[in-house]
Curated annotation (Swiss-Prot):
Membrane topology, from the record: Multi-pass membrane protein
Family membership noted in the UniProt record: Belongs to the ORM family.
Protein name from the UniProt record: ORM1-like protein 2
Quaternary context: Ceramide-sensitive subunit of the serine palmitoyltransferase (SPT) complex, which is also composed of SPTLC1, SPTLC2/3 and SPTSSA/B.
Gene behind the chain: ORMDL2
Amino acid sequence: MNVGVAHSEVNPNTRVMSSRGIWLAYVISVAALHVILLSIPFFSIPVVWTLTNVIHNLVMYLLLHTVKGTPFETPDQGKDRLLTHWEQIDYGMQCTSSRKFLSISPVVLYLLTSFYIKYDPAHFMINTASLLSVLLPKLPQFHGVRVFGINKY
């Protein structure tokens, strides 16, 4: 271990999801969100599951697919300033373990939500739209694509 030595990453965003414990922290934060919503007395169980799913997907979309660039001064001469955080993860390589985890977790939450809402049509449509809005940008075909020019600059 090199104490006092700076990291060797040009862009620290590329390896953050591969850090030790980040997946556990992610699961714990989703569970904490669900427990907090459950503690609100006037929410029914289907509403809590739908809110958990929608809030999770909204936060995931905002943090991974709208935030661009890096929060650090990096020596990459601005190569990553037009890339979203999702496009920077694992240096843009597709099908890595971090990308698989971040793609599968909304699906697992969607399946749990669908089960606990007992496939109520209104909740089901909201949850399906929420899932599609967060899964479609993760597809390899959309790497670097800005639909309708949204988030282009």
